[in-house]
Design a protein with these regions (language model features):
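Active-site beta->alpha loop and helix N-cap motifs at the rims of alpha/beta catalytic domains
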Residues: 16-20, 24-28, 34-36, 44-123
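Short, Lys/Arg-enriched N-terminal segments with co-localized hydrophobic residues
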Residues: 2-15
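Short hydrophobic alpha-helical runs that function as membrane-insertion/retention elements
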Residues: 41, 125-127
Length: 127
């Protein structure tokens, strides 16, 4: 999508990517139907807000991936707190679908886990 405004500083236009921050499947389906969805970000807290249980979070991520398709990244957050737990959870999340991006908390343990996951070729982002 290309947006151009009247501001002279935006003469070349700006690139905008629309990432939806939700765990609600109906919201994701609607946004995907617009044709402008660049990705989905979610976490267990958002999943809990729609009545989801932590032990079903990985299955729910699979359902999201099925809705958006393989070319749309889905950031799924690990709730683990130690490096080893984050790495283990990140590996499990990455096995769900090729478009999963493991979202890791920005903390010392998360930084160490990110290094390991990225070295294994697992897409990672930090929040």
């Amino acid at each position: 999508m290309r947006l151009v405004g009247n501001d002279p500083n935006l003469q070349g236009g700006i690139r905008v990517k629309f990432f939806l921050d939700t765990a609600d499947l109906a919201e994701i389906e609607e946004a995907a139907s617009w044709g402008a969805l660049a990705g989905v970000t979610t976490n267990p807290s958002l999943y809990a807000k729609i009545g989801g249980k932590l032990d079903d979070f990985h299955n729910h991520m699979k359902r999201i991936c099925d809705i958006v398709g393989p070319d749309c990244p889905v950031s799924a957050e690990s709730v683990a707190m130690t490096r080893d737990e984050i790495v283990a959870d990140g590996r499990k999340l990455a096995e769900i679908a090729p478009n999963i991006v493991v979202k890791v908390p920005t903390m010392v343990e998360g930084l160490a886990a990110t290094h390991t996951l990225a070295a294994e070729g697992i897409p990672v982002n930090m929040t």
